[in-house]
Amino acid sequence: MKLYPWLIKPYNNIVQQYQKKKAHHAILIKTPRGIGVSLLIWFISKWLLCLKPIGLNSCDKCHGCKLMSANNHPDWHNFTPEKNNLFSIESVRIINEKIFTCSRQGGSKIIFLSDTGKLTESAINAFLKTLEEPPRKTWFFLVNYKNLNSHSTLNSRCLIYKLFIPEEKKSLYWLKKETVKKNRSCLTALRINQGSPLYAKKFINSNLWIDRINFYECLHDSFKKNNLLKILPLITEKDSQVKIDWICFLLFDSIKFYFNENDNLTNSDQIELIQFFSYNYKNTILDTSIRTWLHCKYRLSNISGINCELLLSEQLLIWEKILNFS
């Protein structure tokens, strides 16, 4: 298991603080999803629990390293949300049990809380007391994916460390090596997944990627035949909201193409289809189309029990009218 290249610098920065004996006992990492924060914390924890670290690296040979590699270290506590997808006050009670007992291996104890956004209000209040005066050689790693929803008092108890989406050029280089796909395909997968290299890799290797290519081919064909209802079976079959996003991305790209923003296209592997929309429809029509599709997506996700096929049939007929199909 290797650390992703964009995480090497954050890893070195954090481990150096432990080397200098200046590390805070609780680190709250604010990060977008899909860049591997859990792996970063695992590698830092492995270094902390290593019996014979070599500089910034763990030795990979000692008993501590072997236990970590087997995901079986008794002093490494990875807490995930309970059945209701929340951390309750019971979770905090269990954390307290772990940290106020002696280390099983005689070294550090590590608590990893995978998503602070899942903490209930009562759990946060209880956890604040735990963070205030933890036992010696107890380290906390917390992850927050929603910057704005972050609890201010919890922030004040921790050292905040921010991670960002890697530079597109670096992500693209990594993705091409990992997937052996063409440059345009990798770039498209990255941009559809908001720059996340891990989500892009998963997407480009999945059936959903093939579904996307087939969907666009069917969409192009339906325009040639002046019958948008041809795509109804594909759009209702599964992942309807994802396919609405694909339509909107494509229409946005067509507007970008009109303004010569070719370097910023999301679907750089669908130039022919983008040109078709850009050459044949005014931007006002494309904009109206996007708005109606977004409204359709809103109804689909917010009205319980709605007839999906009926709603999408209606939307396709509305779209034909907007596009002035004869």
UniProtKB/Swiss-Prot annotation:
Gene Ontology MF terms: DNA binding; DNA-directed DNA polymerase activity
Catalyzed reactions: DNA(n) + a 2'-deoxyribonucleoside 5'-triphosphate = DNA(n+1) + diphosphate
Gene Ontology biological-process entries: DNA-templated DNA replication
One Gene Ontology term, aspect cellular component: DNA polymerase III complex
Pfam families per the UniProt record, alphabetical: DNA_pol3_delta2 (PF13177), DNApol3-delta_C (PF09115), HolB_lid (PF21500)
EC number of this enzyme: 2.7.7.7
Keywords assigned by UniProt, alphabetized: DNA replication, DNA-directed DNA polymerase, Nucleotidyltransferase, Transferase
Enzyme class at the top of the EC tree: transferase
Record carries keyword Transferase: yes
Subunit structure: DNA polymerase III contains a core (composed of alpha, epsilon and theta chains) that associates with a tau subunit. This core dimerizes to form the POLIII' complex. PolIII' associates with the gamma complex (composed of gamma, delta, delta', psi and chi chains) and with the beta chain to form the complete DNA polymerase III complex.
Biological function: DNA polymerase III is a complex, multichain enzyme responsible for most of the replicative synthesis in bacteria. This DNA polymerase also exhibits 3' to 5' exonuclease activity.
Protein name: DNA polymerase III subunit delta'
Gene this protein is translated from: holB
